[in-house]
């Protein structure tokens, strides 16, 4: 093998390692229990398990060293301009959402600080949420259909 071929093979191997790797290790700290912090109280009936709801949300990795506990942003329905619609309490979303959104009213905004066990756990999610990551979400409840 020529020197150029060896260098090409080494570069290709390094590129493959980077491309196949997951997110960097999580170092943001742990949330012990699900935290529900009402930022803005809504009006009307409260959301309950089984309701179809529409929400806007933004999600960040939890960062214990940040004043607002928000680390790297990984997703936002607002950025896409499209709310998420799902049936609450049926396991269609992470458990931290199913448990944390119950009781919200239309127009309400709530911050959820979610421990890894109620989020994506030891597996993480794709290349954006590392294994064992605690999460922070700001959720706005747009609509409830009983």
Where are these regions (language model features)?
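Cross-family detector of peptidyl-prolyl cis-trans isomerase
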Residues: 2-146
